[in-house]
Amino acid sequence: MITARQSRAARALLGWTQETLADKARISLTALKRLESESGLDVYETTRDQARRALEAAGIVFLSTDKGQGVLLVDDHGSKPNPSNAAR
């Protein structure tokens, strides 16, 4: 399950606004704001799922351990060489 903090962190890594994620996830902006709220508002599981799928499609990996939760942005799935690493 995607948390409010994970959603906000993932958007920050991607440089996406709430409007961008709502559009890519095909959910309303209001639904996304509810998901990202810390006030405990009810959110449909389908809303969480659609947001998670959109973020994962953009390269986000959701992390969850007994010590906490987080997000990771995978570097373009390895499809392009990174010029800054080519000489190393």
Q: PLM features: what roles do these ranges have?
A:
Residues T30, L41, L55, V74-D75:
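Short Asp/Glu-rich motifs
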Residues S7-T20, P81-N82, A86:
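Short basic helix-loop element that most often maps to the first helix and adjoining turn
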Residues R26-V43:
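Recognition helix of helix-turn-helix/homeodomain-like DNA-binding domains
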Residues I60-R88:
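Helix-turn-helix/homeodomain-like alpha-helical modules used for DNA recognition
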Residues M1-I2:
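A detector for short, charged/polar N-terminal pre-domain segments
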Residues E45-F62:
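DNA major-groove recognition helix of helix-turn-helix/homeodomain DNA-binding modules
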Residues A9, D23, R34, R53:
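DNA-binding alpha-helical recognition surfaces that contact promoter or target DNA
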